[in-house]
Amino acid sequence: QIFNFKQGSYVLIQGCGPIGLLLLTAVRTMGVRNIIAVDGDEKRLAMAKKLGAAYTANFMTEDAIAKVMDITGGKGAEMAFQCTGSPKAASTVWKYVRRGGSMCELGFFVDNGPTEYNPHLDICNKEIKVIGSWTYQAKDWIQACDMLKEAQKDGLPVEELLTIEQETLHEAPVHIDLSVLIDFRSGQ
């Protein structure tokens, strides 16, 4: 909501784990079609494509920065989301953002150590807007569920994001914390 995406904008999502893939799904339901997914795992990039990423870049097998610049006509993405929790990735995300663009860091929920970047070259010289995301409000859950329902209506395979079978939930030890499973087919 904060970034007010426009038609034709390039939005980059770095990190295609659960957070990045759910974010990709949300951005797609907001009408963004030029989504670039960056990760080092081909399975995750394949899932990103299924969920609506127009482009993917595998930093393990190609120069992802050069590929993103090629995709965006040498400018970079208007918006980049850093979803990895990796200090090394956090130092790279700036290279994907165009002058006057924005970057949202939402991948660090634990202290994974410091990262290195150049405030002059990476932020100030490019006039990048930076925001961190830590938590959410209760109303955000409703909006998130609505976005997932919308994604399902659009034919995006959000159910494939689940990595555990429903039956397995009943077999799990009581002392293990599990994510909440929501069945959108019920309409509630």
Give the label of every model feature segment.
Residues 108-127, 144-146:
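Rossmann-fold NAD(P)-binding glycine/threonine-rich loop
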Residues 9, 101-102:
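Glycine-centered, small-residue-biased loops immediately flanking beta-strands
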Residues 41, 109, 136:
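Residues in the short beta-alpha loop(s) of Rossmann-like NAD(P)-binding domains
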Residues 1-33:
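Short internal alpha-helix immediately C-terminal to a glycine-rich phosphate-binding loop
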